[in-house]
Amino acid sequence: MIAKVDAEAENSKATAQDQGVSSYPTIKFFPKGSTEPEAYSGGRTEADLVSFMNGKAGTHRTPGGGLDAIAGTIEALDSLVQKFTGGSSIAEVAAEATKAAADLKSNAQNKYAQYYVKVFDKLSKSDNYAAKELARLDNILKKGGLAPEKLDEFTSKTNILKKFLEKATGKSEL
């Protein structure tokens, strides 16, 4: 959570004093579960603050609130995508992906790990699934009007699909 506190307000002066706020603006980061802050001394641009928060929270936001090109991707599963596009049997790699995704069951990445499994499954039935699905999602994104959660979901899915396609073509579009 990010909060702005008016340290001059009567009901906030005690908090400001407790936190050692003596000049403004003062930015402090409170790690989850901690009451001890870390002072922020980086740049004050939106890009600097977003970069700092991404590092602390493990997120992939860009200035403006969107997601970057690796949001949703999972390194362990990307290596399996590379193995598949390098010539390994889809059945073999899909089984490995299913096992790797199961290992992430309790992890926040589970939703997108399951999406990798789905893409492998669909590719076993249709070689051009990734390209078709990427085109479909790109069209939906271009139309706009999506709820923020759907925008994030579709952006993450397109990032994953691009991993399948960039490896197949041997180049990155990032």
Tell what function each PLM region has.
Residues 1-174:
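Proteins that catalyze or organize thiol-disulfide redox chemistry
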